[in-house]
């Protein structure tokens, strides 16, 4: 059994503060045979989560505390950069921001489900704890990072 309590969360915050990445996750799987990913993630302002997508799974995100924004992008295959909303170009693939979802339990906005295949990242406004779940083992789930 894994007990999710203040002691665990405080320990994760301490590790996130000490981390250059300004974040720390905690694996909630209880068996190496478990095919899905379920984790707590502590995120601090200034952390850089690369834009990425999970082609084979939705990503379920619940915010337990703090405040962050889930940013979603759509693809625009084109050879020219157009408009200020275009983030960058990699191999002719342009990404355009199309949605920002505030996750803030203090105002009743608890989470979201990022559809399979949608490019996304997060912007952390306040130190936050999120629960993430998606199908597939880490490294075998088809996750793609944009621009790398």
Where are these regions (language model features)?
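A short hydrophobic beta-strand segment most commonly corresponding to one strand
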Residues: 60, 121, 127-143
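Short hydrophobic/aromatic-rich beta-strand segments that constitute the beta-sheet cores
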Residues: 50, 70-72, 132
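Glycine- and acidic-residue-biased ligand/ion/polar-headgroup-sensing regions
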Residues: 56-78
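Structural motif
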Residues: 48, 67, 127-129
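Conserved short histidine dyad/triad with adjacent acidic residue
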Residues: 40-55
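A short, N-terminal "cap"/entry segment at the start of jelly-roll beta-barrel domains
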Residues: 1-36, 50, 81-102
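Conserved metal-binding segment of the jelly-roll/cupin
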Residues: 103-126, 133
